[in-house]
């Protein structure tokens, strides 16, 4: 019997055999490894960073140049609009000393009219200047009144800061670099190293002492009632204005009240124009970082602020002039510092009833168009000063530019109803050099008369005058 056996078939390969790489493929891969393709570099990042660096450097240099030009009086003056430059050319500056331990500063004064007539002295509030009263003093001058408008220190064209030498005041990075450079110029590059070798310690205290002794920094002028009294007194004495009719606008009442109390004999009358302890312009916003830069950098924002709180009748050019004066030469810092020194507890009723002041003729000129609250404030002032004449004008809280003629009419009429002022004129003392010439001439003249010679005398005593004289204007 035959046995049939089945042979197992070889398993079929399911996956097809891989193709063998061709020689050409090996050649390609070898050539790729040997000669890799250079990757193209993107130039965008380089030019991007280059542009950023150049832009930042440009901004820094422009900022530094603008900062230096703002602190340079000549550059600042040349950048002013024609109206401000014309106003400055019509006035003059006077040296005054606010504090005995400080250097004298310059105060700007604008005036109009004959000096031989009644004198009206106008004092502005914080945030304003004599520029706001330029039309008003011209109108008063045309009515036969000598009118004088003063820029209080820290405002307008008067000095707004003073140089402080020495001290340990905080300074910026650029100023500190200049100090180090100046110290190296004076002591040499290796001075500190030599001191360290000799003493075994870095002369840190001596370096700080040297830096502080030579440090020059600008300090904003802070003006309170005491400082204002000194300034008013020196300006009035220097120009020989006393007695004066005093016109106080806005916050000038609190600033000038001390001088009036101490010198009531030199005051013929007082006129208050929308006077309050706090200024109409909200100066506190100029102390808020970010907001202050925007308000003073652009006319639009400052115009809206003035229109909302102070005056809706002022022209854009006049508002912009006030913005420029506040912005330049540390004006903002000075006004904000003076704002902090205002006497907010000032009692106008007590002041008006004090000895000396209660006998001064007074007039209150108040806005009837500002707001109901402001009209109520005017009535309160009128009750506090019952002897004062009370009239209203058709302007806002800053009426001196849009209603200058109306205000001038009120002031001139009020002044004309009062008795004529008696002005005391103190003649200049004879200079020492001239006094010597007088003595020599007198000795020679006595000698000549002794010998019978007659000579004409040079009239020094008539030119300078001896003693004091009373004149009536």
From Swiss-Prot:
This protein's GO CC annotations: endoplasmic reticulum; endoplasmic reticulum membrane; mitochondrion; nucleus; plant-type vacuole
Instruction: Return the SUPFAM superfamilies for the record.
Output: alpha/beta-Hydrolases
Bias (Polar residues): 29-38
Identify the stretch(es) annotated as Disordered. 1-38
InterPro entries the UniProt entry points to? AB_hydrolase_1 (IPR000073), AB_hydrolase_fold (IPR029058)
Q: Does the keyword Endoplasmic reticulum apply?
A: yes
Outcome of gene disruption: Plants show reduced gravitropism, auxin-resistant root growth and AUX1 accumulation in the endoplasmic reticulum.
Tissue expression summary: Most abundant in root tissue, lesser amounts in rosette leaves, stems and flowers and very little in mature siliques.
**Taxonomic superkingdom:** Eukaryota
Q: What does this protein do?
A: Required for the auxin influx facilitator AUX1 polar trafficking and its asymmetric localization within the plasma membrane. Not involved in the PIN proteins localization.
Official protein name in the record: Protein AUXIN RESPONSE 4
Q: Which gene encodes it?
A: AXR4
